[in-house]
Regions:
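Sec-dependent N-terminal signal peptides of Gram-positive bacterial secreted proteins and lipoproteins
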Residues: 1-25
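Short, polar/proline-rich extracytoplasmic segments that appear immediately after membrane translocation
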Residues: 20-87, 92, 183-202
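Hydrophobic transmembrane signal anchors and adjacent membrane-proximal interface regions, especially
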Residues: 33-41, 117-119, 146-148
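Surface-exposed charge patches in extracellular/virion surface proteins
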Residues: 61, 94, 120, 133-135, ...
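Exposed beta-sheet edge/beta-hairpin loop segments within beta-rich domains
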Residues: 76-80, 138-192, 202
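Short, hydrophobic/aromatic beta-strand segments
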Residues: 95-102
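Short beta-strand segments enriched in hydrophobic/aromatic residues
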Residues: 102-104, 179, 199
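A surface/secretory-pathway sequence property marking extracellular, secreted
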Residues: 103-146
Length: 202
């Protein structure tokens, strides 16, 4: 009998609709009683376009695709935890840092004392994960105070900087779950995985 355990994926971003100013600024020195200041606004700025006039480092750049839910499992004959492979894809015009900042258990969970769970992150050959393995559960207990950078994803064109070389695939990473438990009784567990995204200026 398989043990099927589910996770919800909670992605945290700062999203706002706003009038966004030009990302370049200059000062003028006034020696008189008046001044004229140019006002340049963008309505509906496209955060997938690298040339959009969104200030550098602004989280309005963030446009990332993640799964809404994930699963892991094992069987009575094999203690090793397995899972499908899931994708994180950066669709935006700027690179994005991806971090795991929360992992919480459902109040009804009764996890076995020998249960361990890890998050395994994989980038590409030219953009390896910052943290390849993150411990989520150890001896049945959830890891608290998580703040682990997993990877920096290139922008949708595969570029890390404005003058950098575009490398196909560097805007995406994959993740799976690992771990183990020797329990022979089917046990349903539910958790929430919290991811946080940060726009990277160039």
């Amino acid at each position: 009998m398989n043990k099927l355990l589910g996770l919800s994926l909670v992605a945290t971003t700062l999203i706002a609709a706003s009038l966004i100013a030009d990302k370049t600024f200059a000062d003028q020195t006034v020696q008189g009683s008046s001044a004229t200041v140019a006002v340049n606004g963008t309505l509906g700025a496209d955060n997938t376009n690298p040339d959009s006039k969104i200030p550098e480092g602004d989280d309005n750049w963030i446009n990332v695709t993640v799964p809404t839910s994930t699963i892991f499992y094992n069987t009575p004959k094999d203690a090793t935890v397995k899972s499908p492979t899931y994708n994180i894809v950066n669709n935006s015009g700027r690179p994005v840092d991806v971090s795991v900042t929360a992992f919480t258990a459902d109040s009804a969970n009764v996890a076995p004392n020998d249960f361990s769970l890890t998050l395994q992150t994989v980038g590409t050959a030219s953009n390896i994960a910052t943290t390849a393995m993150t411990k989520l559960v150890d001896a049945g207990a959830v890891t608290t105070s998580l703040n682990v950078k997993l990877i920096t994803l290139a922008n949708k064109e595969g570029k890390m900087t404005s003058t950098g070389v575009a490398t196909t695939g560097n805007n995406a990473s994959t993740f799976t779950y690992g771990g183990s438990s020797d329990t022979k009784t089917m046990t349903q567990l539910k958790y929430n995985l919290g991811l946080t995204f940060k726009s990277v200026a160039w």
